[in-house]
């Protein structure tokens, strides 16, 4: 989703979530706004080998062309989506000012076919591996207390752990006071991220929130 792997998980995690959704009758919805057609042509669901019930996509379905996004899923759920009202039928209203815009649809179709033709996901993934390995080497060489990791072409360079807290304490879990207690620490970490982002930019390295590189 929008955090694009900020909290890294193993392949078995999503399979466990899938099993829980099946057990309790809940829909499994994947936010693939960032990961769709990026970590793999089949997105994060292909990368993790898990089939969600519904999937949300962002601008990629329009090849970066404006006014594009998408929702896909299993037929049994997608057939409940409707752009209008149908008497006597259960429907979930889905619509938008530019929904089903033909130019955006064509742009997306063409872009995805080109991604497939050029094997772009795999090539970008190898570049992500190379960049991450280089960052790890630099961190080790200079003894920096940072962490670098990646999922394909999505690379993370974490210098503050902005949202990393110890949730092992039951007292912390039972009350929102835990987060309030640590709010000053959160602000300090956020400020550090912003400063790192500015330093990266000054040296020609564009990041998102001072930690992510696509």
Which functions belong to the PLM regions below?
Residues 1-214:
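Conserved N-terminal phosphate-binding loop of PLP-dependent enzymes in the Aspartate aminotransferase
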